[in-house]
Each structure stands twice: as C-alpha cells, then as structure tokens.
Amino acid sequence: MGSKSPEGHNQAPHGAPNALDKPANPAVKAQNGSGSADLDRGTISNDDDDADDDEKETQINGSSNAGRIYLFPSRPAKFQHRPTDTPSTPEKKKKKRKRSKKKAKPTEAKQTSPPRVPLSTLFPSGYPVGELVADDRTSRVTDEETRYNSRLWDDGFLADYRQAAEIHRQVRQYAQRELIKPGATLSSIADGIEDGVRALSGHQGLETGDGLNAGMGFPTGLCVNHVAAHWTPNPGAKEVVLEKSDVLKVDFGVHVNGRIVDSAFTVAFDPVYDNLLEAVKEATNTGIAHAGIDARVSDIGAAIQEVMESYELEIAGKSVPVKAIRNITGHNILRYHIHGGKQVPFIKNNRRDKMEEGEVFAIETFGSTGKGYLDDDFGIYGYGRNEHVPATGLRLASARSLVKTIDANFGSLVFSRRYLERLGVKSYHLAMKNLIDNGIVESYAPLVDVKGSYTAQFEHTILLHSGGKEVISRGDDY
C-alpha cells in the first residue's frame, strides 16, 4: 500500500514510529519383516514341519543313502509329494499367520478452491519461510546480536509474519487463477480476496475485536489504468466491470497479531502492456536487491529509477517511455501501522535515512505512461484512526458510538465503508463526517495520474535481520 509523499500528506494514523502496539496399536512383528514377505519367499516359520518330513523320509528309504527321494527345501512343505502306498499321518493344522495391518498414512490436508481451510490446519508444524537473501557484510550472528534481535522481535514475530505471508500467497494465486478475468466485477474480486484472507486466518472479524487478532491489514486496492493507488469498491457506488483492455493493480494486506504483510501485483490481458509490467517488476526487484541493513534510501531510489526508466512500450504505434511515479513511496511497517515513519522513494533523492536491523519494509514501485505524478481523485478509499487526537468532547451520540466501534474493531488499521457495513453499522455517514471534521479519523482518496495513461505496481514485504533479509511475501508468481 503506497505511502503518498509528504507534500500535504500526514502520515498519521499509521505514521507514528513511537505509537504503542495494539494488543492484539502396534503391528505384529513377522520373522522376515512381514507375514506377506514370508509367504512370497515360500517359507513358513514352523520348525516342527521340517522334523516330521525328515522322519518320514527315513521310514520310506530304510537308510539315509539308498534310494533317497530328494525333497527341495525351497518348496513349501505343504506342496511336497507323498507316496500313495504309505499311510499318511494327519498333518497338524497350521495356524494362518495374520498379516499385519499397515497403519493408514495420515491424509495430507489440501487447500480448497475457493480457499477456506485455515492455514493452521495445513501447516501444524510451522509456516513456510520466505526468500532468504544473505548479506555478506552482516551474515554473522553474535550472542549480543541474538539478544538484540530478541528485544526487537518477540517469539511470535516470525511465525506471525510467515503465516500472514502464506495467506497472502494462497489467496492471491487463487485470485489470479479464478477471480481476475475480463467481465468480472471489481466488487466480486474484492469479496473473493477478503473472504479468503479471513477464512485462512481463522478470524472472520465479526465479533468485537476479532479483526485485531488476524485478517485484513487494509482494504483491497483494485486500481484500473490511470488510477494508481487507493481505490476499493464501496457500497452504493456504480459497479466497475473489468475489461480486456484494462491494466489492474491488486494491492492487499494480511495481518496476524498486527504483523502486516503488504504485497501487490499488476495484471494485464493485452500483451501491449507487457513492458510496463516488466519495468515495474524489475524495478521492485532492484529495490529489494539494494535494500538491507545500513542501506541508504537515496541509493535505493536512484537504482530503482534507473531500471524502470530504461523501459518503453509501444501504444497505438507510438513509443511511450515508462516513468517512475515521484510522489508515492515505499515505507516501513510498524505493528498495526501499515505506514511507519520512513519512506523509500523510487526516484533520485537526497534523503539521508538508512535502513536498520530489525525493521520491516514494504518495497514497492509504481510506473506510469502518464506524467508520473499522482493527484487525489473524488471519493474515499478508506479511513484511519488518528491516535494522537482523543475522542473527547463529541456532541453527537452517533459519533461517540462510531468511534467506539472503530477503536474496538480496527484500532489503527485502515478500514473501508464495506467493513463497517459488514459489522452491521448503519446510518454512519453524518457521524463519520463529524469524526473527520474533529481530526479523530482521517479519510484517504484514490490517487490518479492523467486520464488515458496506464500505471503498474509491484510490491513485497521484507524483514531485515543480522544475517541479511527475508523477502517474506515472495512466491512463484512474482
């Protein structure tokens, strides 16, 4: 989820780096390995049978040397030939060896389509690790650094992040296969993604406070063509249908205990836009490659811009350069805050900020065929609670009630009108306006380039530790 550059943009409610965290039965053993194996070899482990056969052989021949009838030991005793003129002694009934029953292997749990199996069921022993990238400069772990990391990251930190990342991977790959197609409505895509996230996290978010345990990190962004960021379907708005000529950005967050994974991708059905998508994807990977402990954000931005703006595409017979969008940035992520206090531009800049050990960053880039600068559009993408403004002195009872609902269910997480109505909140428009007017809640508008242009976005979340970095949201798709 892109962070708009500082010009006229307050980072709160999720921009305060010092904000407080929001709590958030054994088988019988056979002689030769198994009963079935013994039968296959033609041997039955019963010593009395061999002794009986030796006695009968001596009685028939009168001596051990003359006229011996050879009995082949490899042939099972019950199949040996007996003379017809010799009365046979009744054979002992042999007990049939019971074949040991093989224990049924536990059936491996598999994800459904649409995804509805909670991730804790699929991965009872731990969640998949992201892409690990060692840093030669820092790939040593001393006792002091281990203690330092333990202060930064508690015992559940990595497990929470890896769970959130795997939820993101499974849901987005389902969306790419089944949801994102020409003719699909954007509301159906958003609902499909968000239903999947809530199901896999095991938290539907309908009970008070449940959404703070796990679920959506922010509303699903579905931005078409010149709309670059911060657009989501809203109740009562005109339905938007995805066209074959569209370029769609899909940006959504998943959190577990406030640890937010922020990752985004772009889909285009017309190959004319392939170079635009490739430029932005390569730019994001360049940013990830340059990111690390002590890396300067100015160096990262310059490297990203150089790669992205080396691409161009041909539209309607004209060569069009890809421009790095200059007033939206990547950002660090804090617990329950999608935007921390640090920004990572994708253009040359003079910032002196450095990345530090223990930090979490969303490395994202946006490219455009337009002017490469975004303006606020009409409408509202979502809302966020300003934690620095107390909810006191509100005259409207509906406003007091609404802010209690927001604090109890979203805390400092960004939410949308769809999320309020899902909780059964009604007639909230006047109350919301009152909260915004008092600075208690902030609203966020869609961000757009010029009409007729096309924009693309790719984004990953990375964790920085003493051994290097973990691209926690990396998948087979991007």
Swiss-Prot record:
Cofactor: Co(2+); Zn(2+); Mn(2+); Fe(2+)
Reaction catalyzed: Release of N-terminal amino acids, preferentially methionine, from peptides and arylamides
UniProt-listed Enzyme Commission number(s): 3.4.11.18
Biological-process GO terms, alphabetical: proteolysis
Residues that bind a divalent metal cation 1: D251, D262, E459
Region of interest: Disordered: 1-124
Top-rank EC class of the record's enzyme: hydrolase
GO CC term, one of those recorded: cytoplasm
Binding site for substrate: H230, H339
Cofactor binding note of this UniProt entry: Binds 2 divalent metal cations per subunit. Has a high-affinity and a low affinity metal-binding site. The true nature of the physiological cofactor is under debate. The enzyme is active with cobalt, zinc, manganese or divalent iron ions. Most likely, methionine aminopeptidases function as mononuclear Fe(2+)-metalloproteases under physiological conditions, and the catalytically relevant metal-binding site has been assigned to the histidine-containing high-affinity site.
Compartments where found: Cytoplasm
Main location group: cytoplasm
Ranges in a coiled coil: none
Biased composition (Basic residues): 92-104
A molecular function (GO) term: metal ion binding
Binding annotation for a divalent metal cation 2: D262, H331, E364, E459
InterPro entries, sorted: Creatinase/aminopeptidase-like, Met_Aminopeptidase_Type2, Pept_M24, Pept_M24_MAP, Pept_M24A_MAP2, Pept_M24A_MAP2_BS, WH-like_DNA-bd_sf, WH_DNA-bd_sf
Comp. bias regions, Acidic residues: 46-56
Secretion signal span: none
Annotated keywords: Aminopeptidase, Cytoplasm, Hydrolase, Metal-binding, Protease
Function: Cotranslationally removes the N-terminal methionine from nascent proteins. The N-terminal methionine is often cleaved when the second residue in the primary sequence is small and uncharged (Met-Ala-, Cys, Gly, Pro, Ser, Thr, or Val).
Similarity comment text for this entry: Belongs to the peptidase M24A family. Methionine aminopeptidase eukaryotic type 2 subfamily.
Annotated protein name in UniProt: Methionine aminopeptidase 2-1
